[in-house]
A protein has these predicted regions:
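A shared catalytic/ligand-binding motif for oxyanion handling
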Residues: 1-170
C-alpha cells in the first residue's frame, strides 16, 4: 500500500495520472486531495484501478477547499466500502474518513483512511476513539489505520506528555 498526503490534486491531475501509470501499487491511499465533483476518477487513475473517495463536505465544515480522502485498488482486488454514516463517526463532520473491507476467498481486513484538519481539540480525538471503539464489525479483525491526524509533534509512547503540553490544541 502506498500512502501520501497530496495537499491538493486539482492542478496536478495529469502528472499524478502519469506517475500512477508508471508505478505498480496494489492499493493507493491519499489524503488532502482537495477534490470535488468536478474532478472524475478517470482523470487520476486508469481503468486498472477502482476508486473510493470522500471529498470534503464544504457545507458541513464551513471551508472552501482542502480535505478529502481517496483509496484506489487494482482492479483484481476485491473490496467493499463500509458505510459509516449511521455510526458515531457521523458526528465528526470535520474529519474525512473511508472504511473499506478488503477480501479474498480465505481472508479479509479493513482499511480506515482518514484526514483530520489541524488544530482539533482533545475532545475531537476522544470522540474519534469512542467512535472507533463502537464499531462491532472490527472486533477480532485485522485493521489498517492510515492517514493524517495532524498531530505534528506526536510520536509513539508520548501521548500523555503530548496532551498535557500547553501548546496542544485546546
Amino acid at each position: 500500500m502506498y500512502y501520501q498526503n497530496t495537499r491538493g490534486l486539482n492542478s496536478k491531475t495529469v502528472s499524478f495520472f502519469n506517475s500512477v501509470y508508471t508505478t505498480n501499487f496494489d492499493i493507493i491511499g491519499l489524503t488532502e486531495t482537495w477534490l470535488n465533483e468536478n474532478v472524475s476518477n478517470c482523470e487520476l487513475f486508469s481503468s486498472d484501478y477502482n476508486v473510493v473517495r470522500k471529498d470534503r463536505n464544504f457545507l458541513a465544515t464551513d471551508k472552501s477547499r482542502g480535505g478529502g480522502v481517496l483509496l484506489a485498488f487494482k482492479s483484481d482486488i476485491a473490496f467493499e466500502k463500509i458505510n459509516l454514516d449511521n455510526t458515531l463517526f457521523s458526528s465528526l463532520t470535520q474529519m474525512d474518513i473511508i472504511c473499506v473491507k478488503v477480501y479474498n476467498d480465505s481472508y479479509f481486513f479493513y482499511i480506515f483512511l482518514l484526514y483530520v484538519p489541524p488544530a482539533q481539540p482533545v475532545k475531537f480525538y476522544q470522540m474519534f476513539f469512542e467512535a472507533f471503539g463502537s464499531l462491532d464489525f472490527i472486533v477480532g479483525a485485522d485493521i489498517v489505520i492510515v492517514g493524517d491526524f495532524n498531530l505534528p509533534d506526536f510520536v509513539q509512547n508520548n501521548l500523555p506528555e503530548y496532551c498535557d503540553n500547553p501548546n496542544f490544541p485546546p
